[in-house]
Amino acid sequence: MFYFDFDGTLVDVWQRYYQIFKDASGISGMSLEEYIRIKKEFPRDADVARAFGRTLPEDYWTKKRSMLENPAYLAHDRLIVPAEQICEFFQNNPCRILTNRRDPVAFSGQLTALGLESLLDACVVLNPDDKKTKAQFLRENHPVEQIVLVGDAEAEAQAAEIDTVKVFLVRTGLRDPQWIPGVENCYIIESISDFMDADKESV
């Protein structure tokens, strides 16, 4: 069974987070490229604002939370590989999307807008407010089945501590492209497209 993270793995979310940061903070005058460079160096939004000589307004986090899954902002996300390639992979392999979202309805609408409506029944949506990690979900729901988790965040490497789970992380999504996993069964891949094109028997 293959599980794919969504944000950052199948879709590029930088434009959405850039727009949200600008709108929620009121900070303008930065390009998308500047935001990405600074965000990778300083993951905390407060530090990003400080890099521009500003502080975040008191209502920043309230605004950001209301914007994160607003369809108007979700519309900024772009597929990293064509919808046809994703759908074909899911059709030919046992797959699910495993994502963290507070609004499953908005997520379903986003899938449809991106041309992935055929995957609506192949999604597991975890609510981040429940504090359940993807590793916990896999441990509880697949105690013996062999699982492959494909993601883009260093934190997802913890799932590789489960004996039955292999983790593949897309290098372009890592904050540090040179980061080396400290656990076995965790591997770095160059692109999601290359992974989907690879011989699945070798995974």
Show where each model-derived region lies:
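Short beta->alpha linker loops
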Residues: 78-81, 102, 129, 152
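N-terminal helical cap/lid subdomain that shapes the substrate entry/recognition surface
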Residues: 1-82
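Short amphipathic alpha-helical segments and helix-helix/interface helices
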Residues: 83-90, 97, 138-139, 157, ...
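Asp-based, Mg2+/Mn2+-dependent phosphohydrolase catalytic module
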Residues: 108-203
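Substrate-recognition element of Asp-dependent hydrolases with the DxDx(T/V) motif
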Residues: 86-111, 126
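Phosphate- and divalent-cation-binding pockets in alpha/beta enzyme and binding domains
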Residues: 20, 47-48, 106-109, 159
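Conserved Rossmann-like nucleotide-cofactor binding loop
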Residues: 9, 16, 103, 155, ...
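Short glycine/serine/threonine/alanine-rich loop segments
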Residues: 30, 93, 165
